[in-house]
Regions:
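Conserved catalytic-core motifs of GNAT/GCN5-like acyltransferases
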Residues: 93-97, 108, 113-129
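Acetyl-CoA-dependent GNAT
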Residues: 2-70, 81-83, 87, 135
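Glycine-centered flexibility sites
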Residues: 49, 73-77, 116
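Conserved glycine-rich acetyl-CoA-binding loop
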Residues: 65-82, 97-105, 109-110
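Short acidic/glycine-enriched loop/turn segments that link adjacent beta-strands
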Residues: 35, 58, 100, 121-126
């Protein structure tokens, strides 16, 4: 089940996943970023994956997406990304390490296109700026 978290009180029935994400981390991010939202993939009240994004006026930006190691390669990241695309219905941008091949394939599958390269952005590793334009 995917749950949209807009404010800390939305977390009342969710348990922390110390290896992945805690409610205190979510609360902190939501207080610092007024545009921030979390999509949580939850099983048995436990967080098994999340997508943290900023919904900024005319666009949305994916800040982070992660799935617990034991739940990878099961379509969880795809489900989170699909849900976000439906929710925001606007252009979406992100940045990914050039070496993160699984993530790049996922983004290309959902029609994200490479826009620019940030040379050495991640401690010597290039970053790829990607964008998915709304198809209207």
């Amino acid at each position: 089940m995917i749950i949209l978290i807009n404010k800390p009180s939305d977390l009342k029935n969710i348990n922390d996943n110390q290896e992945l994400l805690t409610k205190s981390k979510i609360t902190e991010e939501l207080q610092v970023n007024p545009f921030g939202k979390y999509l949580l993939e939850v099983e048995n009240n436990q967080i098994i994956g999340y997508l943290y994004y900023s919904d900024i006026y005319d666009r949305a930006e994916i800040n982070q997406i992660e799935v617990a190691i034991s739940n990878r390669n099961c379509g969880k990241a795809s489900s989170l990304l699909e849900k976000m695309i439906k929710l925001v219905d606007k252009n979406i941008t992100l940045e990914v390490k050039k070496t993160n091949t699984p993530a790049i394939h996922l983004y290309h599958k959902y029609n994200f296109e490479d826009q620019a390269i940030r040379k050495g952005y991640y401690q010597g590793i290039d970053g790829i700026l990607m964008e998915r334009k709304v198809r209207k």
